[in-house]
């Protein structure tokens, strides 16, 4: 039986005398704040587990668990031990962690009274204990008993580890580890904690398991048989369950369900726990355990983090922040330090957007962005069928592992960006004139393409209207005047030189000039067209020189209006700022990876100086 169905409400705020039923087990819930006010129970009754011996002498001699493979059916966990396990698992993030369980054996129950961490080597899908971990395990327990002057009789009763994001169950390696430990130091218990689901749902996701002896002919009771069936995934939902698992765990899921069974879990507290919980209730306390409890008025759940923090952040983003490798347990950071970092990070995009809207975009950046926006609309019309085929062809083998996501490994055939950096370099190297021609072609193609082929999921009508509005912007006045028109003029000049002399000249202008000079009745000399052409060229050259002088005089003059106009053109007018903001908004809505690379603070310094 999975912990999703059995232990979803293991920390509910109800009376100790109230039981509720799940499909196959009973979980007794205890109010962690009002233990001393429970009716009909003396405070000393809470410490009954601490007065028990490490193991029942009769059970130690007879070892009934060797005869009955389902002998242990319940697990008691101290509230402080539960908090220590949850905090340890959360600080590990997407990396599996491991620790030991310390407690006692009483009747058919295993009592977990304390836990401690192990220095192990963990990954996203497994955890390995080295020689240092075993040495630490023995030394910790020895020193713990020495500090208690022999009064502490707890022994190691099991181990715990985490499954970040993929539920509480035992994989093949977990089953082997648990079977090995049960073979030489039974009674032994395995606990699995999922820190990701704990943060998402605000309830501790936990499960307690034991394995069947190898080669045993088990005939489990109806309760344990039901648990075994629920550990095994149903055929109808098997594929859906496997999709949320890492690739290395997909084959393990449900494959070993007949080799172990789960135990009922009950959370208990004691007078020692009450002292710590009382300190946690102090508003001035800043301990790392404080936010694991909340004084909730709801009777159906206890949240894992305070309500005001849940309103201000999305808890799953905190896990993603850890999975990026930003967390280092050696530096003393906790899960709540990362939450504060996330809050700061959440305000960054607005600051960046405000920074962009106050700056004038370079014309080259705008032209490149404009071409990519047009390409995006074209790509949405041509790849609709390909996306549909890809969505139906993806199987279980193509599911991404958490490690794959961190390495930015994409599935085959799925296009994640519009164009690579190499494509950008090629576009810049082809020449400004050719880029202008390609931009005109893109405009024509977008206008001619039928809009009804655009997939509404990737480009809706509002987005297309914004792209169409961008066609009215003249992004490249300077670019076209100095590059494209220059290219066209040089091309026309070559053709012009190859024409005959009488076709090369503008006959109407030349004849008008000849008549203006009073030579209407005279025959035009053969060399007059060349003389007239030279005069026209000198006039054009003089006109250009005069225009440059006038423009320089206006900029350097004493007129205040001219200076304001010059500064306005340098820093950008309100219209240009609005245009820049529209470009950023449109680019972010489309999701261009290249544009996101450009609209960062570092890129701003490179683009705009």
UniProtKB/Swiss-Prot annotation:
Free-text function comment from the UniProt entry: Catalytic Component of the COP9 signalosome (CSN) complex that acts as an regulator of the ubiquitin (Ubl) conjugation pathway by mediating the deneddylation of the cullin subunit of SCF-type E3 ubiquitin-protein ligase complexes.
Location of the MPN domain: 75-215
Binding-site residues, Zn(2+): 161, 163, 174
Comp. bias (Acidic residues): 392-404, 420-431, 445-456
Domain of life: Eukaryota
InterPro entries reported in the protein's UniProt record: JAMM/MPN+_dom, JAMM_MPN+_peptidase_M67A, MPN
Compartment(s): Cytoplasm; Nucleus
Molecular function via GO: deNEDDylase activity; metal ion binding; metallopeptidase activity
PROSITE patterns: MPN (PS50249)
Protein name (database record): COP9 signalosome complex subunit 5
Chain residue ranges for the region called Disordered: 210-248, 381-456
Enzyme Commission code: 3.4.-.-
JAMM motif, short sequence motif: residues: 161-174
Compositional bias ranges of the Polar residues kind: 214-224
Main location: cytoplasm
Gene Ontology cellular component list: COP9 signalosome; cytoplasm
Gene name linked to the record: JAB1
The protein's assembly and partners: Component of the COP9 signalosome (CSN) complex.
Similarity section: Belongs to the peptidase M67A family. CSN5 subfamily.
UniProt keyword list: Cytoplasm, Hydrolase, Metal-binding, Metalloprotease, Nucleus, Protease, Signalosome, Zinc
The keyword Nucleus appears for this protein: yes
Any single Pfam family the record assigns to this protein: JAB
């Amino acid at each position: 039986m999975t912990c999703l169905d059995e232990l979803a409400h293991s920390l509910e705020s109800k009376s100790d005398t109230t039981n509720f039923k799940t499909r196959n087990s009973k979980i007794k819930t205890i109010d962690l704040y009002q233990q001393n006010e429970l009716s009909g129970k003396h405070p000393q009754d809470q410490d009954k587990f601490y007065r028990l011996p490490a193991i029942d002498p009769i059970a130690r001699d007879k070892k009934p668990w060797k005869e009955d493979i389902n002998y242990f059916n319940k697990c008691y966990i101290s509230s402080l031990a539960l908090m220590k396990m949850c905090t340890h698992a959360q600080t590990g993030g997407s990396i599996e962690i491991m620790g030991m369980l310390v407690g006692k054996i009483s009747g058919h129950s295993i009592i977990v009274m304390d836990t401690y961490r192990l220095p192990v080597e963990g990954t996203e899908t497994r955890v390995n204990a080295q020689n240092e971990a075993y040495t630490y395990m023995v030394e910790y327990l020895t020193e713990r008993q020495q500090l208690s002057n022999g009064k502490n009789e707890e022994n190691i009763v099991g181990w715990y580890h985490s499954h970040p994001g993929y539920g509480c169950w035992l994989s093949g390696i977990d089953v082997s580890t648990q079977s090995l430990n049960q073979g030489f130091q039974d009674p032994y218990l395995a606990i699995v904690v999922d820190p990701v689901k704990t943060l998402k749902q605000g309830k501790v996701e936990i499960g307690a398991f034991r394995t069947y002896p190898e080669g045993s002919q088990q005939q489990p009771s109806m309760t344990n048989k039901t648990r075994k069936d629920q550990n095994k995934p149903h055929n109808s939902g098997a594929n859906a369950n496997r999709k949320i698992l890492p690739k290395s765990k997909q084959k393990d899921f449900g494959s070993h369900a007949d080799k172990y069974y789960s135990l009922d879990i009950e959370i208990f507290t004691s007078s020692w726990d009450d002292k710590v919980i009382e300190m946690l209730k102090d508003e001035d306390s800043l301990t790392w355990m404080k936010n694991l409890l909340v004084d909730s008025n709801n009777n159906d759940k206890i949240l894992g983090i305070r309500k005001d923090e849940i309103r201000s952040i999305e808890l799953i983003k905190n896990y993603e922040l850890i999975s990026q490798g930003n967390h280092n347990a050696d530096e003393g950071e906790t899960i709540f330090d990362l939450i504060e970092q996330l809050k700061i990070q959440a305000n960054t995009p607005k600051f960046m957007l405000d920074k962009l809207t106050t700056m004038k975009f370079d014309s080259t950046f705008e032209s490149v962005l404009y071409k990519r926006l047009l390409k995006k609309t074209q790509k949405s019309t041509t790849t609709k069928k390909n996306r549909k085929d890809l969505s139906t062809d993806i199987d279980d083998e193509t599911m991404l592992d958490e490690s794959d996501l961190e390495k930015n490994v994409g599935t085959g055939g799925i296009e994640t960006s519009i164009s690579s950096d190499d494509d950008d370099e090629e576009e810049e190297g082809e020449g400004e004139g050719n880029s202008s021609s390609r931009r005109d072609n893109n405009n024509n193609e977008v206008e001619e393409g039928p809009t009804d082929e655009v997939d509404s999921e990737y480009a809706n009508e509002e987005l297309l209207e914004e792209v169409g509005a961008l066609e009215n912007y003249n992004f490249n006045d300077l670019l076209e005047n100095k590059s494209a028109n220059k290219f066209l003029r040089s091309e026309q000049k070559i053709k012009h030189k190859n024409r005959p002399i009488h076709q090369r000249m503008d006959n109407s202008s030349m004849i008008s000039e000849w008549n203006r000079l009073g030579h209407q009745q005279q025959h035009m000399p053969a060399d007059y067209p060349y003389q007239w052409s030279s005069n026209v060229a000198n006039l054009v050259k003089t006109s250009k020189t005069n225009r440059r002088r006038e423009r320089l005089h206006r900029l350097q003059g004493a007129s205040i209006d001219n200076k304001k106009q010059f500064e306005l053109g340098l820093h950008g007018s309100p219209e240009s700022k609005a245009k820049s903001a529209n470009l950023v908004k449109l680019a972010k809505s489309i999701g261009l990876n290249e544009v996101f690379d450009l609209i960062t603070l570092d890129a701003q310094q490179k683009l705009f100086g």
